[in-house]
Protein backbone atom coordinates (compact mmCIF):
# COMPACT_ATOMS: atom_id res chain seq x y z
CA UNK A 1 0.00 0.00 0.00
CA UNK A 2 2.79 2.46 0.86
CA UNK A 3 4.39 2.07 -2.57
CA UNK A 4 1.15 3.11 -4.24
CA UNK A 5 0.53 6.01 -1.85
CA UNK A 6 4.01 7.48 -2.30
CA UNK A 7 4.22 6.85 -6.07
CA UNK A 8 7.42 4.90 -5.42
CA UNK A 9 7.77 3.40 -8.87
CA UNK A 10 11.54 3.48 -8.43
CA UNK A 11 11.12 0.58 -5.99
CA UNK A 12 10.21 -1.70 -8.90
CA UNK A 13 13.55 -3.19 -9.95
CA UNK A 14 15.44 -6.48 -10.27
CA UNK A 15 15.97 -6.61 -6.49
CA UNK A 16 12.24 -6.40 -5.78
CA UNK A 17 10.43 -8.82 -8.02
CA UNK A 18 7.24 -9.26 -6.04
CA UNK A 19 5.06 -7.00 -3.92
CA UNK A 20 2.57 -8.29 -1.37
CA UNK A 21 -0.35 -6.78 0.48
CA UNK A 22 -1.01 -7.99 4.00
CA UNK A 23 -4.10 -9.82 2.77
CA UNK A 24 -1.99 -11.83 0.32
CA UNK A 25 0.60 -12.62 3.01
CA UNK A 26 -2.22 -13.66 5.34
CA UNK A 27 -3.64 -16.06 2.74
CA UNK A 28 -0.20 -17.54 2.00
CA UNK A 29 0.55 -18.13 5.67
CA UNK A 30 -2.86 -19.60 6.44
CA UNK A 31 -2.42 -22.01 3.55
CA UNK A 32 0.68 -23.33 5.32
CA UNK A 33 -0.93 -23.64 8.75
CA UNK A 34 0.32 -20.32 10.11
CA UNK A 35 -1.37 -17.18 11.38
CA UNK A 36 -0.27 -13.56 11.70
CA UNK A 37 0.23 -12.34 15.25
CA UNK A 38 1.77 -8.94 14.52
CA UNK A 39 2.63 -6.55 11.72
CA UNK A 40 5.00 -3.59 12.00
CA UNK A 41 5.32 -0.74 9.52
CA UNK A 42 8.72 0.67 8.55
CA UNK A 43 10.24 3.13 6.07
CA UNK A 44 12.36 0.61 4.14
CA UNK A 45 12.12 1.16 0.38
CA UNK A 46 9.59 3.93 0.74
CA UNK A 47 7.37 1.94 3.11
CA UNK A 48 7.17 -1.74 3.97
CA UNK A 49 5.81 -3.98 6.68
CA UNK A 50 7.29 -6.85 8.68
CA UNK A 51 5.05 -9.75 9.68
CA UNK A 52 5.39 -12.03 12.69
CA UNK A 53 3.58 -15.36 12.40
CA UNK A 54 3.18 -18.56 14.37
CA UNK A 55 1.55 -21.95 14.00
CA UNK A 56 -2.23 -21.74 14.06
CA UNK A 57 -2.47 -23.75 17.27
CA UNK A 58 0.18 -21.79 19.16
CA UNK A 59 -0.96 -19.72 22.15
CA UNK A 60 0.51 -16.39 21.07
CA UNK A 61 -1.66 -13.31 21.41
CA UNK A 62 -2.36 -11.49 18.15
CA UNK A 63 -2.06 -7.74 17.77
CA UNK A 64 -5.55 -7.74 16.28
CA UNK A 65 -6.14 -3.94 16.16
CA UNK A 66 -3.12 -3.18 13.94
CA UNK A 67 -3.67 -6.27 11.77
CA UNK A 68 -7.31 -5.38 11.14
CA UNK A 69 -6.43 -1.73 10.62
CA UNK A 70 -4.01 -2.53 7.80
CA UNK A 71 -6.36 -5.07 6.23
CA UNK A 72 -9.11 -2.43 6.24
CA UNK A 73 -6.73 0.12 4.72
CA UNK A 74 -6.04 -2.28 1.86
CA UNK A 75 -9.75 -2.93 1.43
CA UNK A 76 -10.52 0.79 1.29
CA UNK A 77 -7.78 1.26 -1.31
CA UNK A 78 -9.37 -1.45 -3.43
CA UNK A 79 -6.19 -3.50 -3.68
CA UNK A 80 -8.21 -6.50 -4.79
CA UNK A 81 -9.35 -4.54 -7.87
CA UNK A 82 -7.47 -3.14 -10.88
CA UNK A 83 -8.37 0.49 -10.14
CA UNK A 84 -5.54 1.52 -7.75
CA UNK A 85 -2.93 0.01 -10.06
CA UNK A 86 -4.28 1.83 -13.11
CA UNK A 87 -4.27 5.07 -11.11
CA UNK A 88 -0.70 4.35 -10.01
CA UNK A 89 0.31 3.90 -13.66
CA UNK A 90 -1.30 7.22 -14.61
CA UNK A 91 0.41 9.07 -11.76
CA UNK A 92 3.73 7.50 -12.73
CA UNK A 93 3.42 8.68 -16.32
CA UNK A 94 2.48 12.19 -15.17
CA UNK A 95 5.37 12.28 -12.72
CA UNK A 96 7.80 11.26 -15.45
CA UNK A 97 6.60 14.11 -17.66
CA UNK A 98 6.73 16.69 -14.87
CA UNK A 99 10.20 15.68 -13.72
CA UNK A 100 11.71 15.52 -17.20
CA UNK A 101 10.12 18.87 -18.08
CA UNK A 102 11.60 20.41 -14.93
CA UNK A 103 15.14 19.09 -15.44
CA UNK A 104 15.20 20.00 -19.12
CA UNK A 105 13.89 23.49 -18.38
CA UNK A 106 16.59 24.06 -15.76
CA UNK A 107 19.32 22.85 -18.12
CA UNK A 108 17.95 25.01 -20.94
CA UNK A 109 18.11 27.96 -18.54
CA UNK A 110 21.82 27.34 -18.05
CA UNK A 111 21.53 25.68 -14.65
CA UNK A 112 23.86 22.88 -13.65
CA UNK A 113 21.99 19.81 -12.36
CA UNK A 114 23.89 16.87 -10.87
CA UNK A 115 22.57 13.64 -9.42
CA UNK A 116 23.00 12.93 -5.72
CA UNK A 117 23.59 9.34 -4.65
CA UNK A 118 24.25 6.47 -7.09
CA UNK A 119 21.51 4.25 -5.69
CA UNK A 120 19.77 1.22 -7.21
CA UNK A 121 16.39 2.92 -7.08
CA UNK A 122 17.96 6.02 -8.57
CA UNK A 123 18.95 4.04 -11.65
CA UNK A 124 15.31 3.03 -12.12
CA UNK A 125 14.28 6.68 -12.08
CA UNK A 126 17.10 7.79 -14.38
CA UNK A 127 16.36 5.09 -16.95
CA UNK A 128 12.59 5.50 -16.84
CA UNK A 129 12.83 9.28 -17.27
CA UNK A 130 15.47 8.93 -19.98
CA UNK A 131 18.06 11.15 -18.32
CA UNK A 132 21.59 10.97 -19.70
CA UNK A 133 24.87 12.82 -19.30
CA UNK A 134 23.32 15.57 -21.41
CA UNK A 135 20.86 16.54 -18.69
CA UNK A 136 22.76 15.27 -15.64
CA UNK A 137 26.52 15.29 -16.32
CA UNK A 138 27.58 13.70 -13.01
CA UNK A 139 26.29 11.70 -10.05
CA UNK A 140 27.79 12.63 -6.66
CA UNK A 141 28.46 9.64 -4.39
CA UNK A 142 30.10 8.88 -1.02
CA UNK A 143 30.98 5.23 -1.68
CA UNK A 144 34.57 5.24 -2.96
CA UNK A 145 34.04 1.88 -4.70
CA UNK A 146 31.65 3.57 -7.13
CA UNK A 147 33.98 6.43 -8.12
CA UNK A 148 34.92 6.24 -11.79
CA UNK A 149 31.97 4.02 -12.63
CA UNK A 150 28.94 4.88 -14.75
CA UNK A 151 25.23 4.50 -14.15
CA UNK A 152 23.89 1.45 -16.03
CA UNK A 153 21.81 2.25 -19.07
CA UNK A 154 22.20 6.03 -18.78
CA UNK A 155 26.02 6.09 -18.73
CA UNK A 156 26.38 9.03 -16.31
CA UNK A 157 29.81 9.30 -14.61
CA UNK A 158 29.89 8.75 -10.84
CA UNK A 159 32.24 11.02 -8.90
CA UNK A 160 32.86 11.95 -5.28
CA UNK A 161 30.64 14.47 -3.52
CA UNK A 162 33.71 16.64 -2.95
CA UNK A 163 34.54 16.73 -6.65
CA UNK A 164 30.91 17.41 -7.54
CA UNK A 165 30.59 20.32 -5.12
CA UNK A 166 33.81 21.87 -6.39
CA UNK A 167 31.99 22.29 -9.73
CA UNK A 168 29.26 24.25 -7.92
CA UNK A 169 26.09 22.65 -9.29
CA UNK A 170 22.96 24.75 -8.91
CA UNK A 171 20.84 21.70 -8.15
CA UNK A 172 21.23 18.13 -6.98
CA UNK A 173 18.57 15.65 -8.07
CA UNK A 174 18.35 13.40 -5.00
CA UNK A 175 18.05 9.77 -6.05
CA UNK A 176 17.87 8.20 -2.53
CA UNK A 177 15.02 10.64 -1.79
CA UNK A 178 13.72 8.62 1.18
CA UNK A 179 16.74 9.90 3.19
CA UNK A 180 15.46 13.45 2.78
CA UNK A 181 15.73 14.58 6.40
CA UNK A 182 19.26 13.30 6.95
CA UNK A 183 20.41 14.76 3.62
CA UNK A 184 19.04 18.20 4.48
CA UNK A 185 20.75 18.03 7.89
CA UNK A 186 24.16 17.13 6.49
CA UNK A 187 24.04 19.57 3.57
CA UNK A 188 23.42 22.85 5.40
CA UNK A 189 26.62 24.40 4.04
CA UNK A 190 25.76 23.61 0.41
CA UNK A 191 22.25 24.99 0.87
CA UNK A 192 23.43 28.11 2.71
CA UNK A 193 25.64 28.85 -0.30
CA UNK A 194 22.61 28.85 -2.59
CA UNK A 195 22.55 25.21 -3.65
CA UNK A 196 19.21 23.46 -3.96
CA UNK A 197 17.99 19.90 -3.81
CA UNK A 198 15.30 18.37 -6.00
CA UNK A 199 13.49 15.54 -4.24
CA UNK A 200 11.64 13.65 -6.99
CA UNK A 201 9.26 11.57 -4.86
CA UNK A 202 6.65 11.18 -3.47
CA UNK A 203 5.99 14.59 -5.03
CA UNK A 204 8.54 16.78 -6.79
CA UNK A 205 9.92 19.20 -4.23
CA UNK A 206 12.74 21.76 -4.48
CA UNK A 207 14.46 22.77 -1.25
Residue ranges and their predicted role:
Residues 1-18, 22-24:
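Short, glycine-/aromatic-enriched active-site segment of Class I SAM-dependent methyltransferases
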Residues 46-91:
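Flexible, glycine-/basic-rich loop-and-beta segments that form/coincide
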Residues 106-127:
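Glycine-rich adenosine-cofactor-binding loop
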Residues 144-150, 162-163:
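Conserved nucleotide-cofactor-binding alpha/beta core module
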Residues 154-207:
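Phosphate-bearing ligand-interacting subdomains
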Amino acid sequence: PSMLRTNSYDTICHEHLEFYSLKVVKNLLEGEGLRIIDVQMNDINGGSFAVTACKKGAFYKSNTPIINWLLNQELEMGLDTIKPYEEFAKRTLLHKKNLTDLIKALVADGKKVFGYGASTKGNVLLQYCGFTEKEIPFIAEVNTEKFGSFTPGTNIPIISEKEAKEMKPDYFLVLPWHFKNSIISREEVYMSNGGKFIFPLPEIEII
